[in-house]
């Protein structure tokens, strides 16, 4: 396992992560190097060396799967590259522009025998091919199979070039609220007196005109759901009372509510 000292608190941001492994180096510091958004991080390794099965034909390779268990990371991926046989640093995958790290088209001419590049721009599922979510665009045709994913979650418009405003799971409500679909979907508990709520993350404009829509997928007979823009100096109490600048209620599943502000 390789870890860094960095903490990842901004759930609305995309991160560009580059891992360089060079087994010929003697120290872990030189053998394992990680850059996050163009900056090299301090790393710590524990347990079995990660290179034991990496890129080996006879081994099953999983994307975002936890090493012990059957769970997977609950994140979006925009571009994933594995270069077999070369130890490349972050400059091959991004660059600084105006002080901001920007991912670029990888400067890689040959991905090696078992290398691959996933752009995640297809919606096909199942056995890997050039038309599925696991399509390899490196030219090596190392397509990955997929399972446990819906077509609606593939090739999402939310991307580093078009970063969506999302709900913020760090803003805790009265009741436990599971977030999914890249923090675009929440499910309330439905218990009496419990309020499910969240603020929109920092990618939402703080000035000017703002508009967003919310779709209700399912609603219990006794449930009452509404959506609003709440002033930063207001609090929601445990019964769900709020002070707002705009509010819309849902009567049944299938309702669509639009909320906006008219500030210039």
Predicted regions span which residues?
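Aromatic-rich beta-strand patches that line glycan-recognition/binding surfaces
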Residues: 1, 34, 64, 96, ...
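Secreted extracellular polysaccharide-interacting domains
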Residues: 1-5, 176-205
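Extracellular glycan-interaction surfaces
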Residues: 1-50, 259-264
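Short hydrophobic/aromatic patches on beta-strands that form ligand-binding or substrate-lining surfaces
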Residues: 17-19, 63, 77-81, 118-119, ...
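Extended recognition patches within non-cytosolic domains
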Residues: 26-28, 40-46, 77-140, 147-160
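Surface-exposed ligand/attachment interfaces on beta-rich extracellular proteins
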Residues: 45-52, 70, 102-109, 189-204
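Extracellular glycan-interaction patches encoded by glycine-rich segments
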Residues: 54-77
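Secretory/extracellular carbohydrate-interaction modules
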Residues: 189-255
């Amino acid at each position: 396992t390789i870890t860094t000292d960095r903490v990842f608190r901004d759930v609305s941001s995309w991160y560009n992560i580059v891992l360089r492994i060079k087994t010929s180096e003697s120290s872990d510091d030189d053998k394992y190097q990680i850059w996050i958004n163009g900056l090299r991080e301090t790393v710590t390794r524990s347990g079995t060396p990660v290179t034991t099965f990496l890129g080996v034909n006879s081994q099953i390779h999983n994307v975002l799967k936890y090493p012990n268990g059957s769970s997977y990371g609950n994140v979006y991926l925009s571009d994933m590259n594995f270069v077999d046989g070369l130890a490349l640093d972050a400059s091959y995958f991004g660059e600084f522009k105006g002080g901001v790290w920007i991912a670029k088209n990888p400067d890689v001419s040959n991905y090696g025998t078992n290398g691959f590049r996933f752009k995640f721009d297809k919606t096909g599922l199942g056995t890997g091919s050039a038309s599925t979510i696991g399509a390899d665009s490196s030219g090596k045709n190392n397509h990955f199979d997929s399972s446990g994913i819906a077509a609606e979650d593939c090739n999402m418009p939310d991307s580093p070039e078009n970063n969506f405003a999302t709900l913020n799971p760090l803003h805790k409500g009265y009741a436990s609220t599971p977030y999914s679909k890249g923090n675009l979907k929440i499910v309330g508990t439905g218990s009496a007196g419990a309020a499910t709520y969240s603020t929109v993350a920092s990618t939402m404009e703080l000035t000017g005109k703002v508009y967003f829509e919310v779709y209700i997928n399912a609603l219990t007979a006794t449930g009452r759901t509404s959506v609003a823009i709440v002033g930063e100096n207001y609090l929601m109490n445990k019964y769900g009372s709020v002070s707002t600048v705009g509010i819309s209620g849902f009567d049944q599943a299938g309702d669509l509510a639009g909320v906006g502000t008219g500030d210039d």
